[in-house]
Amino acid sequence: MKHFTIFQNFYYVIAEMTEEEIVSAIASSTYRKRVEEIRHIFAEQGEKAANEKKKELPAIAFSACYRGRRTKENLVKYLGHIVIDIDHLSEEELARILPIIRGCRYTRIVFISPKGMGVKIVVRACHPDETLPETLQEIANFHHAVYTKLASLYAQLCQI
């Protein structure tokens, strides 16, 4: 079942992928040239220029499925996946924390961010009874609360 929505320009659906397909695409050479270009721009021109170039990469909606544009009205289903960003890390810090993050039982996916100075950690969360919130307000409240707890957990775990 393909349930993660992939967007171009952050709003337009271009594909749906499984978790395995996403991990494979990130690990393969599919986006390597574009990511290397972003890292080069970051090193040569700075963060602002790199952020502009980064917008050209497809975006993955880990938290929800959408039909059409990425808007509240087009949200089909909340998936409960939360993305934790840890940014502004040195190469040494990245090398130190990646094994820690990979070893955490909550981590589903982890990858180095496009600029090469941070990590993106994908974790799945749900209520104790394995259900997920359904209304937009329940989703917003749940997502915020769980994100806050998980960001704190990973910060403590990685000692950052």
Over which residues does each language-model region extend?
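Helical (often loop-to-helix) elements that flank the catalytic cores of nucleotide-handling enzymes
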Residues: 97-103, 125-158
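Generic hydrophobic, aliphatic-rich segments that mediate packing or membrane embedding
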Residues: 78-80, 97, 106, 115-117, ...
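DNA replication initiation on ssDNA origins
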Residues: 1-80
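Short, surface-exposed ligand-recognition loops at beta-strand->loop->(often short) alpha-helix junctions
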Residues: 85-94
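Histidine-centered divalent-metal-coordination microenvironment in nucleic-acid enzymes
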Residues: 84, 108-135
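Catalytic micro-motifs at enzyme active sites that drive phosphoryl/nucleotidyl and oxygen chemistry
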Residues: 69-74, 98-114, 159-160
